Regions:
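Charge-rich, low-complexity N-terminal segments
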Residues: 2-166
Length: 166
Protein backbone atom coordinates (compact mmCIF):
# COMPACT_ATOMS: atom_id res chain seq x y z
CA UNK A 1 0.00 0.00 0.00
CA UNK A 2 1.41 3.40 -0.92
CA UNK A 3 1.61 6.12 1.71
CA UNK A 4 -1.12 8.09 -0.01
CA UNK A 5 -3.62 5.20 0.22
CA UNK A 6 -4.58 6.64 3.60
CA UNK A 7 -5.79 9.68 1.65
CA UNK A 8 -8.06 7.47 -0.47
CA UNK A 9 -10.26 6.33 2.44
CA UNK A 10 -13.91 5.94 1.52
CA UNK A 11 -16.94 5.78 3.77
CA UNK A 12 -19.00 4.46 0.88
CA UNK A 13 -19.62 0.74 0.48
CA UNK A 14 -17.60 -0.31 -2.55
CA UNK A 15 -17.16 -3.93 -3.51
CA UNK A 16 -15.20 -5.56 -6.27
CA UNK A 17 -15.55 -9.05 -7.73
CA UNK A 18 -13.26 -11.51 -9.46
CA UNK A 19 -14.14 -14.88 -10.98
CA UNK A 20 -11.85 -17.76 -11.88
CA UNK A 21 -13.13 -20.52 -14.15
CA UNK A 22 -12.44 -24.10 -15.23
CA UNK A 23 -10.36 -25.89 -12.61
CA UNK A 24 -10.63 -29.61 -13.45
CA UNK A 25 -10.46 -31.64 -10.26
CA UNK A 26 -12.05 -34.61 -8.55
CA UNK A 27 -13.33 -35.17 -5.06
CA UNK A 28 -15.32 -37.60 -2.98
CA UNK A 29 -17.67 -37.16 -0.03
CA UNK A 30 -16.79 -40.24 2.01
CA UNK A 31 -19.71 -39.69 4.43
CA UNK A 32 -22.33 -39.70 1.65
CA UNK A 33 -24.46 -42.84 1.35
CA UNK A 34 -25.18 -42.22 -2.33
CA UNK A 35 -22.90 -41.93 -5.34
CA UNK A 36 -21.03 -38.91 -4.00
CA UNK A 37 -18.87 -41.22 -1.86
CA UNK A 38 -17.27 -42.30 -5.15
CA UNK A 39 -14.51 -40.26 -6.78
CA UNK A 40 -16.09 -37.91 -9.30
CA UNK A 41 -14.97 -34.72 -10.97
CA UNK A 42 -16.09 -31.30 -12.05
CA UNK A 43 -14.68 -28.18 -13.58
CA UNK A 44 -14.79 -25.91 -10.55
CA UNK A 45 -15.21 -22.14 -10.69
CA UNK A 46 -14.87 -19.50 -8.00
CA UNK A 47 -16.37 -16.05 -7.49
CA UNK A 48 -14.86 -13.69 -4.91
CA UNK A 49 -16.46 -10.53 -3.51
CA UNK A 50 -14.03 -8.04 -1.96
CA UNK A 51 -14.68 -5.07 0.31
CA UNK A 52 -12.39 -2.07 0.81
CA UNK A 53 -11.58 0.74 3.23
CA UNK A 54 -9.72 2.77 0.60
CA UNK A 55 -8.89 2.74 -3.08
CA UNK A 56 -5.43 2.10 -4.47
CA UNK A 57 -3.53 5.14 -5.70
CA UNK A 58 -4.77 4.16 -9.19
CA UNK A 59 -8.38 4.27 -8.00
CA UNK A 60 -8.98 0.50 -7.88
CA UNK A 61 -10.86 -1.32 -5.17
CA UNK A 62 -8.71 -4.40 -5.86
CA UNK A 63 -6.09 -4.40 -8.63
CA UNK A 64 -6.86 -7.62 -10.51
CA UNK A 65 -3.25 -7.73 -11.72
CA UNK A 66 -2.22 -8.24 -8.08
CA UNK A 67 -4.23 -11.48 -7.79
CA UNK A 68 -1.58 -13.69 -9.44
CA UNK A 69 -0.74 -15.35 -6.11
CA UNK A 70 -4.42 -16.17 -5.57
CA UNK A 71 -4.61 -17.68 -9.07
CA UNK A 72 -1.45 -19.71 -8.38
CA UNK A 73 -3.01 -21.01 -5.15
CA UNK A 74 -6.19 -22.01 -7.00
CA UNK A 75 -4.07 -23.83 -9.61
CA UNK A 76 -2.16 -25.63 -6.85
CA UNK A 77 -5.32 -26.68 -5.03
CA UNK A 78 -7.70 -27.47 -7.91
CA UNK A 79 -5.92 -28.04 -11.23
CA UNK A 80 -5.92 -31.81 -11.86
CA UNK A 81 -6.09 -32.67 -8.17
CA UNK A 82 -8.10 -34.99 -5.95
CA UNK A 83 -9.66 -33.08 -3.05
CA UNK A 84 -10.47 -35.12 0.04
CA UNK A 85 -11.74 -34.61 3.55
CA UNK A 86 -8.71 -34.68 5.82
CA UNK A 87 -10.56 -37.33 7.89
CA UNK A 88 -11.28 -39.64 4.93
CA UNK A 89 -10.77 -43.18 6.29
CA UNK A 90 -8.99 -44.17 3.07
CA UNK A 91 -6.53 -41.25 3.09
CA UNK A 92 -3.56 -43.63 3.46
CA UNK A 93 -4.64 -45.53 0.35
CA UNK A 94 -4.95 -42.28 -1.58
CA UNK A 95 -1.51 -41.18 -0.31
CA UNK A 96 -0.04 -44.40 -1.72
CA UNK A 97 -1.58 -43.55 -5.09
CA UNK A 98 -0.14 -40.04 -4.82
CA UNK A 99 3.31 -41.45 -4.02
CA UNK A 100 3.00 -43.68 -7.10
CA UNK A 101 2.36 -40.58 -9.22
CA UNK A 102 -1.28 -41.43 -9.96
CA UNK A 103 -2.90 -38.38 -8.33
CA UNK A 104 -2.22 -35.16 -6.43
CA UNK A 105 -4.05 -35.03 -3.10
CA UNK A 106 -5.35 -31.88 -1.47
CA UNK A 107 -7.38 -31.89 1.75
CA UNK A 108 -9.93 -29.56 3.28
CA UNK A 109 -10.75 -29.56 6.99
CA UNK A 110 -14.47 -28.99 6.31
CA UNK A 111 -14.68 -31.51 3.48
CA UNK A 112 -14.09 -31.39 -0.27
CA UNK A 113 -17.58 -30.27 -1.32
CA UNK A 114 -18.50 -26.78 -2.37
CA UNK A 115 -19.36 -25.76 1.20
CA UNK A 116 -15.94 -26.77 2.55
CA UNK A 117 -14.21 -25.32 -0.50
CA UNK A 118 -15.94 -21.94 -0.19
CA UNK A 119 -15.11 -21.79 3.53
CA UNK A 120 -11.46 -22.76 2.96
CA UNK A 121 -10.96 -20.26 0.13
CA UNK A 122 -12.66 -17.46 2.05
CA UNK A 123 -10.36 -17.90 5.05
CA UNK A 124 -7.19 -18.37 2.98
CA UNK A 125 -7.90 -15.46 0.64
CA UNK A 126 -9.05 -13.09 3.39
CA UNK A 127 -5.82 -13.67 5.36
CA UNK A 128 -3.70 -13.28 2.23
CA UNK A 129 -5.51 -10.16 0.95
CA UNK A 130 -5.44 -8.35 4.29
CA UNK A 131 -1.68 -8.91 4.53
CA UNK A 132 -1.11 -7.90 0.91
CA UNK A 133 -3.11 -4.67 1.26
CA UNK A 134 -2.12 -3.87 4.87
CA UNK A 135 -5.76 -4.23 5.92
CA UNK A 136 -7.20 -2.04 3.16
CA UNK A 137 -9.18 -4.86 1.48
CA UNK A 138 -10.84 -8.09 2.61
CA UNK A 139 -13.07 -10.91 1.39
CA UNK A 140 -16.82 -10.52 1.85
CA UNK A 141 -17.80 -13.87 0.33
CA UNK A 142 -16.67 -16.71 -1.88
CA UNK A 143 -18.84 -18.80 -4.17
CA UNK A 144 -17.51 -22.24 -5.08
CA UNK A 145 -19.26 -23.77 -8.08
CA UNK A 146 -18.95 -27.40 -9.18
CA UNK A 147 -21.08 -27.04 -12.31
CA UNK A 148 -23.75 -24.82 -13.86
CA UNK A 149 -26.37 -26.01 -11.37
CA UNK A 150 -24.63 -26.36 -8.00
CA UNK A 151 -22.67 -23.95 -5.85
CA UNK A 152 -22.19 -22.86 -2.27
CA UNK A 153 -21.52 -19.35 -0.99
CA UNK A 154 -19.65 -18.73 2.24
CA UNK A 155 -20.08 -15.25 3.71
CA UNK A 156 -17.13 -14.12 5.80
CA UNK A 157 -18.24 -13.44 9.41
CA UNK A 158 -15.03 -11.40 9.86
CA UNK A 159 -15.55 -9.13 6.84
CA UNK A 160 -14.92 -5.45 7.33
CA UNK A 161 -12.13 -3.09 8.19
CA UNK A 162 -10.05 -4.28 11.17
CA UNK A 163 -7.42 -1.53 11.13
CA UNK A 164 -4.29 -0.80 9.14
CA UNK A 165 -1.56 -3.43 9.39
CA UNK A 166 2.12 -3.84 8.55
Amino acid sequence: MADNDFDNVTEECFTSTKSFWNFPCAHRQYRHEGNCHLIHGYSRSFHFVFGIKSFTKEGFAVDYGDLKELKAHLDHMYDHTLVLDEEDPHIDTFRKLENAGVCRIRTHPMGPGMEGTAHYLCEWTDNWLRKKTRGRAWVISVEARENDKNSSIYTNPNAGFKGWTG
